């Protein structure tokens, strides 16, 4: 990454209620989109469970992310993320925390 790309990433990354959001380009309709790492959709207990593989953790996270309207983010620079629309990161973070802690 170049210094310009690093600075751009720093400016587009926000942490809200313990969840990191990375701003990406708007969708085709102009709605703001954010990428969230898949581990934000898992509990600490699930991450510490040695019986769950990374693939199983990802499957759990994907089910929760899809329920909230997120889809798999396929860009190579950000591995293991889900992308969704959000006009309010606080509300989105609260929804993620609510479904994870259900």
What are these regions (language model features)?
Residues 10-12, 22, 61:
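A residue-level detector for conformationally permissive "hinge/kink" positions
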Residues 101-102:
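Short acidic DE-rich linear segments
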Residues 2-13:
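Negatively charged, low-complexity tracts enriched in Asp/Glu with abundant Ser/Thr
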Residues 92, 96:
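Basic, glycine-rich
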Residues 18-19:
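N-terminal acidic leader/helix
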Residues 3-4, 50, 98:
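Absolute N-terminal positional cue centered near the fourth residue
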Residues 24-91:
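Acidic, low-complexity, intrinsically disordered interaction modules
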């Amino acid at each position: 990454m170049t210094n310009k790309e690093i600075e751009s990433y720093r400016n587009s990354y926000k942490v809200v209620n313990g969840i990191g959001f990375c701003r990406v380009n708007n969708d085709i309709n102009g709605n703001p989109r954010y990428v969230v790492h898949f581990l934000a959709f898992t509990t600490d207990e699930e991450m510490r469970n040695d019986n769950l593989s990374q693939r199983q953790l990802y499957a759990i996270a994907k089910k929760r992310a899809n329920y909230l309207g997120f889809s798999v983010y396929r860009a190579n620079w950000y591995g293991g993320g889900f992308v969704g629309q959000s006009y309010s990161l606080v509300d989105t973070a609260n929804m993620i925390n609510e479904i994870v802690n259900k």
